[in-house]
Amino acid sequence: MDKNLLKRFAIESKKDLTKKIETKIKSFFIDEKFEETQIGDIYYLTNNVHTLTLIPEDYKKRKLLIDRVNKLGLIQVIEEATFTWFNRIIALRYMEIHDYLPLTKNNESLGIRVLSSTDNTPIPEIMKFTNLVNPELDIDFKKEKYVELKDDNEKFKYVLLLVCKKLGNVIPQVFDGMTDYIDILIPDYLLNETGFVNKLITEIPEDNYEQVEIIGWLYQYYNQIEKDKAMATKNAYQKNEIPYVTQLFTPDWIVKYMIENSLGRYYIEHNSDSYTPIINKFKYLIKDNICFKSENTNVESITFLEDRKSVV
């Protein structure tokens, strides 16, 4: 895993996505005066420069976006949308490489990639029409709407939103289906040479995804600039700065070390007959001073809790 590459990619991508989403959010006349007209089901919002055309669904999402901006402020909503799309697309990339995407009604994989193609063509596999009309693909795909869209970037955004909505029912922590105001801020031109998806595919080789740790490292590097600024300027932090200086990614070996020398040691000491088979599997256990207890403990009865103060 090339951590220097991941760091550079995460920092540059955050800057680029932030600019694009800031431009996108302002295109919805969030803080501008405009004239609104409605013809049939279509809404037209016009200022002195251009006209924004919205279908009823997007008109509703725009109102939700305005409510969110009024509640949190423009800057925080931009940060929220930027991270959400960064996080979603990184997760999709990891899952498609490992064939984890639950795209059927039974949440099983179809072996179809969403962001890329195994034959290295620039169009993602899911956009091939035979895949879109696959009866096992459980997304709310509308052929007529797809055909009406102007270019591959618009078609891809349409399909990507459908996939995220599907995954929101399976992995709501990442693909929350209740973020309509963020959905309309999906970045444009994702498949272009300088688009986030294209750069993700072309700049980070697939072998970097062999370990799930890549997601943790990208998350840490995504926050690197804010973390460095906060730590360099003060000893006391504002509420919004605390995550940057406290939420650090824990590498896999540290997690294993902590578990093997806490829960693992406790279990071995209370189950002496399990010592040999378990000890051969534990790579990080400190074997000195293991004191066996007379009573056995059922592993299912052990509560393992991590909190802010300690690991029990």
Where is each model-derived feature located?
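Preference for the N-terminal adenyl/adenosyl cofactor-binding alpha/beta module
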Residues: 1-312
